[in-house]
Amino acid sequence: LMRSFVRALEWADTLGLVRLALTRAEFAYLMFPESPLSAPPYSQAPALAWMQYSYSSGTGLERLLNRLGGKPLGFRSLSCSESPVVEGSNRIWKDCTVRFSPPGGSAQTLQLFASIIEREGRYKILSYANAF
C-alpha cells in the first residue's frame, strides 16, 4: 500500500491515489455494517456516514496533491497506532504518520492520511483527511 501511495503521490496520480482508498461500495458493504455508526445510539444512515468520510477525504486528497504531488518524497517510514481499532472483521489503524526526507530538504513527519483499514489481509486508505 505504501509503495503504491508514494509512487502515486510522486507522480501526482490522482486516479492512482483514489484507487488506494476505500470505495463507496466497500464502505457500504464491508465497513459500515460493522461500524459503531450503524448501531444505537448513532444509527446513522449509510449515505450520511459515507458523505462525511468522502468529504473530508476528498478535501485532504486535494490538499495533499497541492502540497506534495509531483515531487520526490524520499519516503522513510510509516507509523500508525500501536493497536488497531477492531470493528468486526475490520481493523482500523489510526494516527498514521509518514516520515519522509525530500532531496535537498529536511526530514519531516506528517499525517498525510488519517487511517488505514485492514480486512482479511488487504489494506486500503480509509480517509485522506490530513494535517494540511
Q: Could you describe each region identified by the protein language model?
A:
Residues 111-117:
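Hydrophobic/aromatic beta-strand elements that line small-molecule binding cavities or substrate pockets
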Residues 1-15, 19-20, 26-31, 37:
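Short, low-complexity N-terminal intrinsically disordered segments enriched in polar/charged residues
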Residues 117-132:
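Short, low-complexity, Pro/Ser/Thr/Gly-rich segments in the mature regions of secreted, periplasmic
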Residues 35-106:
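Surface-exposed, charged secondary-structure patches
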Residues 104-109, 132:
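Short, surface-exposed beta-strand/loop "edge" segments at domain boundaries and coil↔beta transitions
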Residues 109-111, 125:
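A sequence-level detector of short linear motifs
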Residues 33-34, 132:
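Sparse recognition of residues in long alpha-helices and their boundaries
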